[in-house]
Amino acid sequence: MKILIATDGSDFSRKAVEKCCEILGKESGAEIKIISLVERPMPMANEPFAISGEYYLALEEDLRRQAKNAVSDAEEIIRKNTGGNKLSLESEVLMGNVKRVIVDEAAKFKADLIVVGSHGRGFFNRLMLGSVSDFVVHHAPCSVLVVKTETDGDKE
């Protein structure tokens, strides 16, 4: 089984990684690719012109650092929770439009399953449950698992 996990390092993403470990159980031979995405920050029309290009470069570098930490955390969770299974694990930080890159990477990786959290943090928080997960579910070349936490929705 080939599984693509998209993470931003949020608690919701960690839950998705843990759910992936539950699905894998003691299965060996799985191929897992963890991706975290950086969308290039763009100036807003109402920002002062005094904001320099260096500001955006620094912001992009910070986003890359956060993305690297997110994939490292996900790798650690998988290694810890799969009991040393024989599985292939790779990770990558990618640039581009979040929803498009997830779908494109799933096709390139020939994923059997995409795993994402139901929400994210920061930029992802505004997008993940709505447009990103909706786009991925409707355009992915494989099945998609959107993992909710117990704080999502009603607990009734």
PLM features: what roles do these ranges have?
Residues 2-54:
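Small/aliphatic-rich secondary-structure junction motif
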Residues 76-114, 151-156:
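Structural beta-alpha unit
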Residues 113-135, 153-156:
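Glycine-rich, Arg-bearing micro-motifs that act as flexible, cationic patches
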Residues 16, 44-47, 103-104, 127-128, ...:
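Short, well-ordered secondary-structure micro-motifs
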Residues 33-35, 90-94, 145:
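General small-molecule cofactor/ligand-binding pocket signal
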Residues 142-154:
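Short, flexible loop segments at boundaries between secondary-structure elements
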Residues 37-69, 152-156:
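Acidic, proline/glycine-rich short linear motifs
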